[in-house]
Regions:
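Position-specific recognition of the canonical hydrophobic site in helix A of tetratricopeptide repeat
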Residues: 9, 43, 70, 74-77, ...
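Alpha-helical segment of the N-proximal tetratricopeptide repeat
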Residues: 1-27, 33, 37-44
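Helix-start (N-cap) detector for alpha-helical repeat units in TPR-like alpha-solenoids
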Residues: 32-33, 66-67, 100-101, 134-135
Length: 155
């Protein structure tokens, strides 16, 4: 049933997918793969508060779940709660220090806070792990552009 729900979500049949995730969770409330997939589907539907609650439920079951930490972080980032998002990414990095996605996401939040030098460090670290990681490449380029424009304004 979980695979069927995932297929529905992939086909953007979100409401039907949520119904199946709920069926799985009704019989097994601690099924973390279902919680994570449901949270991601709710996030795609724009139901961010429900998604946030679902990620928190997954983290109650497993506080070191990397997918839940990243998902929760991206929701916080979208709400402009960048410091809180960074806490989620830092928690993920404590568990898995060479985690390109967590580094790139942290870089994005740092960039939004105007901490471009720190953001650039995160993007570069992410790219040493995965040189083709699009989010890190785009973030690095944007940070470099912004730093260059700041320097040109000073002179």
């Amino acid at each position: 049933m979980l695979e069927q729900a995932s297929d529905l979500a992939e086909d953007q049949e979100y409401d039907e997918a949520i119904l199946l995730y709920d069926k799985v969770l009704h019989s097994d409330p601690k099924n973390n793969p279902s919680l994570l997939d449901k949270a991601a589907t709710l996030q795609r539907m724009g139901k961010n508060s429900q998604s946030f609650q679902t990620y928190n439920s997954a983290l109650k079951e497993d506080s070191k779940n990397l997918d839940a930490l990243i998902g929760k972080g991206t929701l916080l980032h979208a709400k402009s709660k960048f410091s809180d998002a960074i806490e989620c990414y830092d928690s993920a990095l404590k568990i898995k220090p060479r985690f390109a996605m967590a580094l790139a996401c942290k870089g994005m939040s740092l960039g939004e806070m105007g901490e471009l030098d720190s953001a650039l460090v995160c993007f570069k670290k992410a790219l040493t792990i995965d040189k083709d990681y699009d989010l890190a490449n785009m973030g690095k380029q944007k940070a470099l552009e912004l730093l260059k424009s700041q320097k040109s304004k000073k002179y």
